[in-house]
Curated annotation (Swiss-Prot):
Active site: C177, H277, E279
Keywords annotated in UniProt: Glutamine amidotransferase, Isopeptide bond, Transferase, Ubl conjugation
Protein name from the UniProt record: Putative glutamine amidotransferase Rv2859c
Native species: Mycobacterium tuberculosis (strain ATCC 25618 / H37Rv)
One biological process term in Gene Ontology: polyamine catabolic process
EC number per UniProt: 2.4.2.-
Length: 308
């Protein structure tokens, strides 16, 4: 069966979402001292909390290295004598960012409101929507498959809100595995909930934490093709995949089964999502380096826009 679903191009990627999906700067002083009160809320003037704040609010860590936010898990975790809810992310993700020249900041799920989302995005120069458990199928109008993970509505809502805010700002975005699915669903797409039912094999997820390496082929003329060439062997661990493609997105890679392995938004803004796990191949930093370079450009544009 050909899974490379018809792409939608010409839709508005920033259109209002379905209601069910809504859900200090360094001045040379001590970077750990309390910020000036005027920096505490980018929406204190009653403006749009999702628009970029004044550039002087954008990077508490300085402008030399771009700040990249990575979404994270919020799960019950055992460590030492503790068995508690905790936010976490495998170290490979933020090592990819730091090795590529960025500063990584983790963004565990929290209650969503426009002010909190705006405050977070004001501190970032790029966003990574990371891998994790399956999206709630209700987000794309389906009932759950027996193999679909128990929903994490808090993480879903948090990532949808961050992603939509980042897209509105023109902020660079990289999606990884689940992050590809978040991007697709946020723009109106749907998912195959369990690939083995369609393909007749489990080659995309071997199980027990073992990553499968699969060849993918890129689409000529896409950003991804410019970055990695015509093909690559990539580490995969997913049992779900893109079905109908979200509005404005183009398919930039497929595998030998026709499964969509990458999506991107055309245009000047870096918005790229891969179904595989580049953090598991840190000897190849091309995707992370491209994101960090785009984040540096975003930071520079914000700095140039600052009133003199």
């Amino acid at each position: 069966m050909d899974l490379s679903a018809s792409r939608s191009d010409g839709g508005d990627p920033l259109r209002p979402a379905s209601p069910r999906l809504r859900s200090p700067v360094s001045d040379g002083g001590d970077p750990l001292r309390p910020a000036s009160p005027r920096l505490r809320s980018p929406v204190s003037d009653g403006g749009d909390p999702l628009r970029p704040a004044s550039p002087r609010l954008r990077s508490p860590l300085g402008a030399s290295r771009p700040v990249v936010g990575l979404t994270a898990y919020l799960e019950q975790v055992r460590t030492g004598v503790w068995d508690i809810p905790a936010g976490y992310l495998p170290a490979d993700y933020f090592e990819g960012i730091t090795m590529a020249g960025g500063v990584a900041v983790l963004l565990p799920p929290q209650p969503v409101d426009p002010e909190s989302v705006g405050c977070v995005l004001d501190s970032l120069h790029a966003l990574v929507i990371t891998g994790g458990y399956d999206l709630d199928p209700a987000a794309y109008g389906q009932e759950p498959h027996p193999a679909t993970d128990h929903p994490r509505p808090g993480r879903d809502a948090w990532e949808f809100a961050l992603l939509r805010g980042a897209l509105q700002r023109g902020m660079p975005v990289l999606g990884i595995c689940r992050g590809t699915q978040v991007l697709n669903v946020a723009l109106g797409g749907t998912l195959h909930q369990h690939l083995p039912d369609i393909l007749g094999h489990s080659g995309h997820r071997a199980g027990n934490g073992v990553f499968t390496r699969l060849p993918v082929h890129t689409a000529s003329g896409t950003r991804l093709a410019e970055l990695i060439g015509e093909s690559a062997d990539v580490p995969c661990y997913h049992h779900q995949a893109i079905d109908q493609v979200g509005e404005g997105l183009v398919v930039s890679a497929v595998d030998v089964d026709g499964v969509i392995e990458a999506l991107e938004l055309p245009g000047d803004t870096f918005v790229l999502a891969v179904q595989w796990h580049p953090e598991k191949s840190l000897d190849d930093l091309r995707l992370f380096k491209a994101l960090v370079d785009a984040a540096s450009g975003y930071a520079g544009r914000q700095s140039q826009a600052e009133p003199r």
